[in-house]
From Swiss-Prot:
Residues 513-523, 561-590 have a biased composition (Polar residues). Residues 13-94 form the Death domain. Residues 208-473 form the Protein kinase domain. It comes from Mus musculus (Mouse). This is Interleukin-1 receptor-associated kinase-like 2.
Amino acid sequence: MACYIYQLPSWVLDDLCRNIDTLSEWDWMQFASYVITDLTQLRKIKSMERVQGVSITRELLWWWSMRQATVQQLVDLLCHLELYRAAQIVLSWKPVPESTSPLPAFPEAVKPGAVATSRRNLKDEQEKVRPVKPRSLLDTGPIMAGAQRQRPCEMDAPCSLKTDAPDSPQSKYCSTSTSAPKQERLLGLPGDRLFWSEADVVQATEDFDQSHRISEGTFADIYQGQRNGVAFAFKKLREVAGSSPGSMDRFLQAEMQLCLRCCHANVLPLLGFCTGRQFHSLIYPYMANGSLHDRLWAQGNSDMLPWPQRASICSGLLLAVEHLHSLDIIHSNVKSANVLLDQHLNPKLAHPVAHPHPDNKKTKYTVMRTHLFQASAAYLPEHFIRVGQLTKQVDIFSCGIVLAEVLTGIPAMDKDRSPVYLKDLLLSEIPNSTSSVCSRKTSMGKAVVKEICQRHVEKRAGLLPEACEEAWATAVSVCLRRRNASVEEARVSLAGVEEQLRGQLSLPWSRVSEATGSSSNTPEETDDVDNSSLSVPSLVMMASCPGAASSPLFTGHGAAQPSTSGRQEADSSSEACTGPQTPQNATETSWKIEINEAKRRLMENIVLYKEERLDSSELFGP
């Protein structure tokens, strides 16, 4: 085996790391000492086992692979240490050559032979004979002839990817996977206009004139065009340097499957396509307000987005990703530049780059070439960049970076900044909040929330209520955490923010501080339970109450919110919905139960343990 360790498939590395991680500490250190002779570096990698979700064997192999270690060296070391089970995992994998010829003929297969040339010639002849409007593109089954060979069987496919979709003529708005997508129904209509000829596309874009080009990407260029007085956006696909033959066709099939099978209010719909001999193109509606990236930094003389509009856009993004994940579809290209805004500033998630189903059904993820996504590295987790394992976690992490961009006003990547990536700036704040013994039991999410609220919240868009800041930052931390990241939990956090800000649309932003409570510099009488102990679901519940539009999200227990009975803590949620009480009885004695600080901290940790955000060792540890 002459290949390097970093060329091993992800499923092989997963099985190998799980096997070696189960070794005793003595056996593992013996294996690692042959790989790393520097004891300082070895101890650094060994200390990573305390971090949740980190495989120290994978970190060790990653360090070794960066030194050009080969698979043969790894197998020899495993056999020398008599770790035959781990060696068998590597030996059971055999690189599959791209050519179907026997192994001795592999050197000849490097050059294009007569067989490959004849196949290409046959394919060109078929393209010439093919009619201008092929009937296979008008069926509701496979989108192209090659798509039938790639898509999974009907038993394995999700409901939205199956061919037989129920007709629902009465439904005028498609947002779930139970009804037939609108674009998919259009394919079966006689005389539909979904298929565009090359002449139509050339005429609409004036032969892809440079003055019509909107943006330039890795896989395609976007042009603006017009047909019958209607503006369209044309995505002209192109071959990527170093890609395999036919990659453009596979990319076209994948994006068409995703757009046609997923009909959602926050996913950019497909209006047409063109599969000609000169170029391949996808046609979408033209988004008048550009992308979220442009509006965040006021590019193109656009106005600054206010907080209510920002919350609505982020909620729409999370709804789109949650819908795709419910269909087992991974977008893998979530970033602010791909969140397009229509004339009403409604978000539309666009430009997916992944296949609508995993290529490897055994491991349930797709191995992708990371060098094709270097431009999007600012939105990708470090684990994906290293290993190449594409899961739903990648989309959720990218959503967290977009939410952080909107909240902080800091670009995801800035070459003139240190660190360059916003994700490194946020994650670097976590160790600063883990210095004391008590804070070691605090989850990573709370540390991120505190740092974001104190240092990085955007000020140019106006004042944001403190409770909204915490809920928004909580949504960011939920997406960025390595274990149990949940797009649904982040959406619930933002739902409360959106509901609260929507009720304040009639108020000038200069008066928001008056409507949301006293200033942080004003002395305030409080009890021993601070606002940080309140959970995010309580924010959502209070924001949905009728009186929450004009009252603070978190009702205080001090002079501004005096108590008139001994059941104040039990009825705190109802007080938030009914509004503040009159201060006429503020001098009366307030009977309240004082909770021991250690007991309160234990109760909070038990809640985190039930949510699987805290290990038992951290719950009952020192």
